[in-house]
A protein has these predicted regions:
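Short, glycine-/small-residue-rich phosphate/pyrophosphate-handling segment
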Residues: 132-155
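Active-site-proximal specificity loops/subdomain of glycosyltransferases
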Residues: 21, 25, 54-82
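Conserved donor-nucleotide/metal-binding helix-loop-beta segment in metal-dependent transferases, i.e.
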Residues: 96-122
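A short, N-terminal amphipathic alpha-helix
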Residues: 36-53
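N-terminal nucleotide-binding beta1-loop-alpha1 segment
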Residues: 1-23
């Protein structure tokens, strides 16, 4: 039996748009938040590129439809129409994403299974599936962008497997401490965040919130935390 063609759909807004929708450090202005999202997107790209799979980045200028669900369905179907019959979907939200997560998703989809990487907020950070497991009518009814999504999407997909335990989800209330603690994996981003916060301290002569935490104060001297 011939193996189906597999592609990655990177469904993510441009950094300039994302910085307006979900600023992670709103008090530091638009440009800082744009740069944060550029680094996050660069990191996701570095994870996708070694797979050798075709990657289709559908940003906000290319998305068509009313509402998140319809836009995502249209994007997925546009890739199926190119002749691909297996698809992995991810976006910017999984800042804890590692190569092992994507590799496991590839393995599951190639084995004929659908798969999900859950978020701690009840969402889905990565979706893997065959074209035959996709149902537009069902997907349009799913509670996208809510804490109910994962459970309903899991029930919607046949032969669905979990890629890993739930990971933190990037949102406007993200704890910057978490990004700093992950500095072993987000070295450039962590260094930039530290520089921004330290500049604020120097200009305002007041400690940024993270300095109140002794753990955060010592982050630059620590190695990366162990994560299974």
């Amino acid at each position: 039996m011939k193996e189906g063609r597999l592609a990655i759909l990177y469904f993510a807004y441009r950094p300039e748009k994302e910085a307006i929708r979900k600023p992670l450090l709103p008090e530091f202005g638009h440009d800082v938040n744009v740069h944060i999202y550029k680094m996050l997107q660069s990191r996701v790209s570095d994870i996708m590129q070694p797979t050798g799979l075709p990657v289709f980045h559908v940003d906000d200028t290319m998305q068509k439809g009313n509402g998140f669900g319809e836009r995502l369905c249209n994007a997925a179907e546009s890739i199926f129409k190119k002749g691909f019959d297996r698809l992995i979907i991810l976006g910017n939200d999984a800042y804890g994403l590692k190569p092992k997560h994507l590799n496991k998703a590839i393995e599951q989809v190639r084995a004929g299974n659908s798969c999900l990487l859950p978020s701690e907020l009840g969402g889905a950070l990565m979706i893997g599936m065959e074209k035959s497991q996709y149902n537009r009518a069902h997907w349009l009814e799913l509670p996208w962008c809510t804490e109910k999504l994962f459970n309903e999407l899991f029930d919607c997909l046949s032969s669905c497997k979990l890629i890993d335990k739930a990971l933190p989800e990037l949102n406007s209330n993200v704890d910057i401490h978490e990004l700093l603690i992950m500095k072993g994996e987000l070295t450039e981003l962590a260094a930039y965040l530290l520089a921004v916060l330290e500049t604020s301290f120097n200009e305002n002569h007041a400690y940024p919130p993270f300095h109140e935490d002794p753990l955060a104060e010592n982050l630059r001297f620590r190695g990366p935390p162990f994560m299974a």
